[in-house]
Amino acid sequence: MLRKFASGLITRAVSTNPAPRVVAVPRRLMADAARPFKVLGLQQIAIGGLDKKTLSSLWVDTFGLTKSGNFRSEKENVDEDIIQLGKGAATVEVDLMQPVDPNKSPKVHEPALNHIGLWVDNLPACVEHLTQQGVRFTPGGIRKGASGFDVTFIHPKGNEKTPLSGAGVLIELVQAPPHIIEALK
């Protein structure tokens, strides 16, 4: 039998002879057994502006990060440079984004910190579980992202049907490839 307290602790009745006792277990330890996926780490941050050259001036020219690619999608109204921070499994992608058309949606430059991306070890199970929990996703489902990984997005705002959201932050869930899963687990 489990009991949940406001403090975040979950207690479990443990049967022993002659009488049962209650053991406090931190919520973070219990969550792994109830969740069919694991968030492994930060995969990316996406920063938007009207001119990605201005963003690149800071991130590439001043900070010395390396451009590793670019991505353009009329449908998603985005033209982005993909910058790398770190190495190996610790690499974080910094996406410098400008809108293809600043008058169309989505407005990838508003807010300037557009979204964060999280590596997950099992994206389909993650989406199924979070959907059952009432998490709102953006339209489009699981699809290939700019870096070639399967992705989906948690909507920044909840609604009546799906009240859980990114609380003002667009969150990209990214299927981690096997070498990232192994390195970060």
Residue ranges and their predicted role:
Residues 2, 30-31, 35-40, 47-91, ...:
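Core segments of cupin and vicinal oxygen chelate
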